[in-house]
Amino acid sequence: MKNKYFLSFIFFINFFIFSFNLKATPDSFADLVEELLPAVVSIASTTIVENKNNQPIPRFPEGSPFDEFFKEYFDNERPSSPKQRPMIGLGSGFIVDNSGIIVTNSHVIEGADEITVILHNQNEYKATLLGRDPKADLAVLKIDSGNESLKAVKWGDSVTIRVGDWSIAIGNPLGLGGTVTAGIISAISRDIGNGPYVKFLQTDASINRGNSGGPLFNINGEVIGINTAIISQTGGSIGLGFAIPANSAKKIVTQLKDFGRTKRGWL
């Protein structure tokens, strides 16, 4: 009889542990993502560049029929070719204050003559650059949304992150705004040679070009990192994504918002 009760007790304990592990793995992120999406934005940066289509006229021997042909061709084509053209860059960002303060990567808006922020509902607003820190690869923007209310994210504590924790990336990869991917934290304090100021969180959540500047969330819906870089031989995601830790970013974001630059101490 004692053995029977003992076996029943063991079965109950194992069942309890199994049930607990099932609860630790969410059935879906859908409810959480629905709440987070309005706080994530797409960013389009427009830079005016010189048109490089004005090739020199090929040289031919004097009297060659090609000489006259190419002179006539280039004379007819060049006037119709504009001297300048817009170049569009795409990235991601997220709202940190419902007054219109937005965080992204510095490289997303570097050299931009015009910055446009596209909200999740597809409404577009011109953005003003409040400040950027190229060394930390962070930038802070400001939009005036008028009467439209904005949803802001909550910062999380990246110091408490452990390898194996869930991570959720939301952004604008390849111009596909509102794309959501999930994975785990693969490593912390990762040095990828991008400078001495930041050690990155590594995640296997799929991150591609255009995700730069977007948020990396924990399972509680808090921003624990800013997606910044990938390592890939193909240019696409192979599960090696890197994010600036939230605790490092928060201090810099505050300074960029208040002063337009980062103040660093020197010895």
Model-predicted segments: where are they?
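Bacterial N-terminal signal peptides that target proteins for export
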Residues: 1-9
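Bacterial N-terminal signal peptides
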Residues: 8-18
